[in-house]
């Protein structure tokens, strides 16, 4: 009897702490803070992300480079002295000899319109690639935030479930103590209830630890708002797009990034092919001679001569062709990889949804009925309080099993639902 009383003295205060104080904290402390819904968490994370801002600047930089590359080079202003005598009677004179001229000219390098259009197009494609990178970063951010939010939500639900059971166990311990006093209960029953109380307190502690860890994880993206309690769970039975639509794969951000990489490589190839046609330079010069002689104007054209195209231009084209082949191979590999991942994630999501619904239809009613029957038997004098606790613990375990399945289904849903950031008009529910 003294041993049982000692155990109870150690367990019961902790049990009260979790079953009463924690419930009061949830009721009062969280009431002062507005719940944080998943959509709000996603929006807040995006607004705080410096990576997304950096991607916007990268796209802007690519556009600016493309516009600059499409312009003609700056003209070159040229000055010079031609044919200055260095000996004889007219040594160093700038006006005595008829061949001596002071020259000023302008030279302009001219690229073909097609080449300049390609340079501008390259900047546009590079900007589109940066936008695709931004969308891929955004999709990853939304997925990570959603997973952390879901982990925190279900950790809180788990703690709440164990707190309710802890309060029930507390009542049973009180009843057992009264029963021992009037001879209806015995010490072994009380010890068994106190063991359940200790186990329940540990479960609450573990769930609260998981909730704190999830809060710390999500604070990386949300800052102080991570301390707000989670709002209602999202509808994890419906996706924002039809996973059976073959076009979904092409809209995945990772696929779009590699598709833009391929387009960029193809643009570089076209530029390399236009490199066979050299850029011309046109020069106009004005030459001033001595007062006794006429001034002159010169016009000239400079054309590079590709003497060894097989060693320069052709090798540049071959390098660009290899880059195109590499980009296409990476795109095809990513399509296969992401297609397999998408199919696997869809099957996992549907399977978890089916299992959770099946247990809700079968296991939960059975466990609840068993707990009711155990209590009725005890009230009628045909059962024991230990049997009541066992049945109620079984009911809690059943609800925990369903809760874990719902959490896993919600995580699978998040990986699918936020794989696309643009969504789709159609929705598809899990069968």
Features from the language model and the residues they span:
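Acidic, low-complexity, intrinsically disordered peripheral segments
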Residues: 1-12, 87, 401-431
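Membrane-embedded beta-strands of outer-membrane beta-barrel proteins
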Residues: 104, 299-301
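Short, charged, amphipathic alpha-helical segments
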Residues: 120-124, 187-196, 385-393
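Periplasmic alpha-helical coiled-coil/stalk elements that build and connect Gram-negative outer-membrane
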Residues: 2-5, 36, 137-251, 345-348, ...
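Small/polar (Gly/Ser/Thr/Ala-rich) solvent-exposed segments
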Residues: 53, 76-97, 109-138, 153-156, ...
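N-terminal signal peptide c-region/cleavage motif recognized by signal peptidases
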Residues: 26-29
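Amphipathic alpha-helical coiled-coil segments
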Residues: 54-69, 130, 137, 141-164, ...
């Amino acid at each position: 009897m003294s041993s049982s009383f000692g155990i109870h003295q150690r367990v019961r205060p902790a049990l009260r702490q979790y079953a009463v104080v924690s419930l009061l904290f949830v009721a009062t402390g969280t009431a002062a803070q507005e719940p944080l819904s998943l959509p709000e968490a996603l929006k807040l994370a995006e607004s705080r992300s410096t990576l997304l801002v950096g991607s916007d600047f990268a796209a802007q930089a690519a556009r600016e480079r493309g516009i600059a590359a499409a312009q003609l080079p700056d003209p070159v202003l040229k000055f010079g002295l031609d044919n200055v005598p260095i000996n004889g009677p007219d040594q160093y004179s700038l006006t005595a000899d008829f061949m001596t001229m002071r020259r000023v000219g302008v030279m302009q390098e001219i690229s073909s319109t097609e080449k300049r259009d390609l340079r501008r197009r390259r900047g546009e494609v590079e900007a589109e690639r940066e936008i695709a990178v931004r969308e891929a970063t955004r999709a990853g951010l939304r997925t990570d935030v959603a997973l952390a939010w879901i982990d925190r939500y279900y950790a809180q639900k788990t703690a709440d479930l164990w707190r309710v059971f802890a309060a029930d166990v507390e009542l049973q311990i009180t009843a057992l103590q009264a029963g021992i006093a009037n001879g209806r209960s015995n010490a072994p029953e009380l010890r068994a209830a106190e063991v359940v109380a200790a186990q329940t307190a540990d479960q609450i502690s573990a769930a609260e630890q998981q909730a704190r860890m999830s809060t710390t994880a999500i604070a990386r993206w949300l800052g102080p708002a991570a301390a707000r309690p989670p709002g209602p769970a999202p509808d994890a039975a419906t996706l924002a797009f039809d996973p059976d639509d073959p076009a979904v794969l092409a809209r995945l951000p990772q696929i779009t990034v590699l598709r833009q990489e391929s387009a960029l490589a193809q643009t570089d190839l076209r530029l390399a092919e236009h490199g066979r046609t050299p850029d011309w330079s046109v020069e106009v010069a004005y030459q001033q001679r001595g007062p006794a002689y006429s001034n002159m104007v010169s016009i000239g054209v400079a054309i590079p001569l590709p003497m060894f195209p097989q060693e320069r231009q052709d090798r540049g084209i071959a390098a660009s062709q290899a880059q195109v082949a590499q980009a296409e191979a990476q795109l095809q590999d990513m399509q296969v990889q992401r297609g397999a991942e998408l199919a696997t994630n869809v099957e996992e999501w549907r399977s978890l949804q089916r299992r959770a619904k099946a247990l809700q239809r079968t296991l939960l009613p059975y466990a609840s009925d068993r707990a009711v029957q155990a209590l009725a038997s005890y009230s009628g004098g045909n059962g024991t309080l230990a049997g009541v606790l066992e049945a109620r613990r079984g009911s809690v375990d059943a609800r925990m099993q369903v809760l874990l399945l719902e959490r896993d289904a919600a995580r699978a849903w998040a990986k699918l639902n936020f794989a696309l950031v643009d969504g789709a008009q159609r929705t598809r529910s899990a069968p």
